[in-house]
UniProtKB/Swiss-Prot annotation:
Protein name per Swiss-Prot or TrEMBL: Trifunctional NAD biosynthesis/regulator protein NadR
Originating species: Klebsiella pneumoniae
GO terms under biological process: NAD biosynthetic process
Domain HTH cro/C1-type: 7-47
Keyword Repressor included in the entry's annotation: yes
Function: This enzyme has three activities: DNA binding, nicotinamide mononucleotide (NMN) adenylyltransferase and ribosylnicotinamide (RN) kinase. The DNA-binding domain binds to the nadB operator sequence in an NAD- and ATP-dependent manner. As NAD levels increase within the cell, the affinity of NadR for the nadB operator regions of nadA, nadB, and pncB increases, repressing the transcription of these genes. The RN kinase activity catalyzes the phosphorylation of RN to form nicotinamide ribonucleotide.
Pathway: Cofactor biosynthesis; NAD(+) biosynthesis [regulation]; Cofactor biosynthesis; NAD(+) biosynthesis; NAD(+) from nicotinamide D-ribonucleotide: step 1/1
Enzyme class: transferase
Length: 47
């Protein structure tokens, strides 16, 4: 299970929407959706 599979499962179990998760994490709903559905790869974090 990848990190994104775990995150997707946790979001579903908590009954959260993508909006509720994306905003506090600094992502757009669209970007988060693409990550969770493996449409794109996560960018490396910059220091």
């Amino acid at each position: 299970m990848s990190s994104f599979d775990y995150l997707k499962s946790a979001i579903k179990q908590k009954g959260c929407t993508l909006d509720e998760v994306a905003e506090p994490s600094g992502m757009t709903k669209g970007y988060l959706s693409q990550l969770l559905n493996r449409k794109i790869k996560a960018r490396a974090r910059r220091s």
